[in-house]
């Protein structure tokens, strides 16, 4: 383990990849987290013409934050950086949930920003106090988001296709995330253990 990482408490929510001595403890999971940077660029380019007051303009920034915090966590496998990584992920799920509630008519669009800020402060505090609460909140929010997406007005085949694609990517990705933390389906020997793991696939699918 890199000397600097020994100063931090090891995470209790381990992932599959075996440790490697050096600066980057889990190389495959660290490198795969860079997929969020690619997603950030794609969203930024596709939303460049959107009004700056729209929630989607926050997505590229949040995705960059997720990429940075995820790289830091997987490189160190430190508990504190896992908390920060989870807080960043919750920023995205909070934004998706609040905007989904607005688009489905549960709240007015004028309320999305104060509600997003309030929920983000609350989820960050809860995650800082107990990492497990952060995982629980992210799971419940994801279920609520999928529920809202299912009930969005779907007036054309393109929208329906986009929603199906999102759900088909996120659902198996989330299952793999859970399996990885449970130690199920892990590759433990040889170079393959540092190439393909459930958490690696989660990064790619969720990005």
List the model feature ranges, each with a label.
Residues 1-207:
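Multi-pass alpha-helical transmembrane bundles in non-GPCR membrane proteins
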